[in-house]
């Protein structure tokens, strides 16, 4: 991931202004430590901090067309860039090997109506010197972060992270996913318009082969890299499938020719935590060289302020899950790895969180998946991107591939729901799709096993330790006055209050606090899903452990799953509150590296 900053229409064109913009851009240097570039045309500035993944020797930014009348800065990976290059080979002279350079000929050919032709994740700004207009766009789901604001002189500021613009803007906000901003048209408009966005319940039958093929394609296209890469592996279903598919197809890729097909697996957790044990088992099956990173509760507590600074949030669940990932990312980068694949998005698309078990019907189930996918940019996408970008590590998420999303979200939700009578547990559609008797991807007991929420999976003592620590940092008197001190999104417990104090010190602007989502949550639910169960309304802890069936789920899941692994038929769409459920909150903090840079067991 790179970092971009654009200041457009500034009243001040001076060298001092240029120096100030460059200084602001350097606040994003952690995202792109490999190179920096700055373009200026009168009061328009486009800056980029580059993390070189594709074409590291020739892809420095800003990017230009042949006569330098169009300039682009981008943070993105365009997986169909080779196809687009062939399309424009006779019309456009490419000057770099950067995948993002294809944005320029697309704009020259189609104007601003080309964004949906990009297959990948991105946040970019394009300036056209001929018309003195500009456009900016963000990918469909918001995998790559982006913010937009207005300076006191009326200039538009656009940045990968708000830390580069918050001190210069009188107001700013999240640049919405799936949108583009056009100075010519005078504002934002949505370019991503999938059918599922209307939240109408689909009726397409489950097609396991179609689902499997869409996911395999999503993984394979993300193996596009010119640097050492890996796959996060926590031992849960989603990260294990990402690792298994990578293992199966890596040998056929250009990446294998460059870095070899040997896989190294990494996992982080407290000593004896569920993720360490589960990841070790998956790594043994896949034949990886396994590496374990251990951290202590104190290590995590010491990192909290840095995590909040980089994540730019005070959301409790995000901070809990980000901290181990943040610690691990530093170790991964130190081994020479610059890109990893991860399993974010599966639980939102397929209803894999613990609480989905209690959905009263398929209509509510589907609406909740829609709400969750739409909100990913404020939660798991934000966490995965920023916690790793803090150390110049890029995360790619195949579950959030546009084609895979279309397949998953067009399926009749009855197939996704738990049904004990038919042997269907959560994410059964994905498990069944990869249950290949002849050429198994994973053993059945792994394929059909419950997975913890990530912050629980790295070790239950992590959450308990956070609660105990913050209990000592925030007094009862402070909590009594919480609504007066923080009238917007008032903290409901001491852990939330502690995170909020740090956030407000780092980002004191009203606009900053309004970028953070709020509302009650249970096991990562949206506020709307709280209405499903009366007892949930009184909870102030988002942990999945508060779901009644969580404690018994692991014990019963394997027995149920093996007995029903091959079950077929139609779901009745009803949820049974006493049966096993699964969650895979952040899909792994672990890593499978496709090169030989790391060997043996290491401890953080």
Swiss-Prot record:
Residues that, per the record, bind L-glutamine: 50-54, 75-77, 99
Catalytic reaction equation(s): L-aspartate + L-glutamine + ATP + H2O = L-asparagine + L-glutamate + AMP + diphosphate + H(+)
Coiled-coil ranges per UniProt: none
Top EC class of this enzyme: ligase
Keyword Nucleotide-binding: yes
Chain residues that bind ATP: 232, 268, 342-343
Enzyme Commission no: 6.3.5.4
Protein name per the record: Asparagine synthetase [glutamine-hydrolyzing] 1
């Amino acid at each position: 991931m790179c970092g971009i900053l654009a200041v457009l229409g500034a009243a001040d064109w001076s060298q001092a202004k240029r120096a100030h913009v460059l200084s602001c851009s350097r606040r994003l240097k952690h995202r792109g430590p490999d190179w920096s570039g700055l373009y200026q045309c009168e009061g328009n500035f486009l800056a980029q901090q580059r993390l070189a993944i594709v074409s590291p020797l020739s892809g420095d930014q800003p990017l230009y067309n042949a006569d330098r009348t169009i300039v682009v800065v981008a943070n993105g990976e365009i997986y169909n860039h080779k196809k687009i290059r062939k399309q424009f080979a006779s019309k456009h002279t490419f000057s770099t090997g950067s995948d993002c350079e294809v944005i320029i000929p697309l704009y020259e050919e189609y104007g601003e109506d080309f964004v949906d032709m990009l297959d990948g994740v991105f946040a970019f700004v394009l300036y056209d010197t001929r018309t003195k207009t500009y456009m900016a766009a963000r990918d469909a789901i918001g995998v790559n972060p982006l913010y937009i604001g207005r300076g006191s002189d009326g200039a538009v500021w656009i940045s990968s992270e708000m830390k580069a613009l918050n001190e210069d803007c009188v107001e700013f906000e999240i640049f919405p996913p799936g949108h583009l901003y056009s100075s010519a048209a005078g504002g934002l408009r949505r370019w991503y318009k999938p059918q599922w966005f209307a939240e109408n319940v689909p009726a397409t039958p489950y097609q396991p082969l179609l689902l499997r093929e869409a996911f395999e394609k999503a993984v394979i296209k993300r193996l596009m890299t010119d640097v050492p890469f890996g796959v996060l592996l926590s031992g849960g279903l989603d990260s294990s499938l990402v690792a298994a598919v990578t293992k199966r197809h890596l040998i056929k890729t250009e990446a294998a020719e460059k870095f070899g097909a040997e896989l190294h697996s990494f996992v982080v957790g407290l000593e004896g935590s569920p993720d360490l044990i589960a990841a070790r088992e998956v790594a043994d099956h896949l034949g990886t060289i396994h590496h374990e990173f251990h951290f202590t509760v104190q290590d995590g507590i010491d990192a909290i302020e840095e995590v909040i600074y980089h994540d730019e949030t005070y959301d409790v669940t995000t901070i809990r899950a980000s901290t181990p990932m943040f610690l691990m990312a530093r170790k991964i980068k130190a081994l020479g790895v610059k890109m990893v694949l991860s399993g974010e998005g599966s639980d939102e698309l397929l209803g894999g969180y613990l609480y989905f078990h209690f959905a009263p019907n398929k209509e509510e189930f589907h609406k909740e998946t829609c709400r969750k996918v739409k909100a990913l940019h404020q939660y798991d996408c934000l966490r995965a991107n920023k916690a790793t970008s803090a150390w110049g590590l890029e995360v790619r998420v195949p579950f959030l591939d546009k084609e895979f999303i279309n397949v998953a979200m067009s399926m009749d939700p009855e197939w996704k729901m738990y049904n004990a009578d038919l042997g269907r547990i959560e994410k059964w559609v994905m498990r069944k799709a990869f249950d290949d008797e002849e050429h198994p991807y994973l053993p059945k007991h792994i394929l059909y096993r419950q997975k913890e929420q990530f912050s629980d999976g790295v070790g239950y003592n992590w959450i308990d330790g956070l609660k105990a620590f913050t209990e000592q940092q925030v007094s009862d008197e402070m909590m009594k006055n919480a609504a007066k001190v923080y009238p917007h999104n008032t903290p409901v417990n001491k852990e939330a209050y502690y995170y909020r104090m740090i956030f407000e010190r780092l980002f004191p602007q009203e606009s900053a606090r309004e970028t953070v989502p709020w509302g009650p949550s249970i096991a990562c639910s949206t506020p709307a899903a709280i209405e499903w169960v009366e007892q949930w309304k009184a909870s102030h802890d988002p942990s999945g452990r508060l779901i009644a069936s969580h404690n018994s789920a692991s014990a019963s899941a394997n027995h149920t799953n093996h007995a029903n692994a091959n079950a077929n038929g139609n779901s009745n769409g009803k949820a049974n509150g006493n049966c096993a459920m699964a969650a895979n909150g952040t899909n792994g903090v672990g890593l499978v590296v496709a090169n030989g840079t790391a060997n043996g067991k290491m401890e953080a």
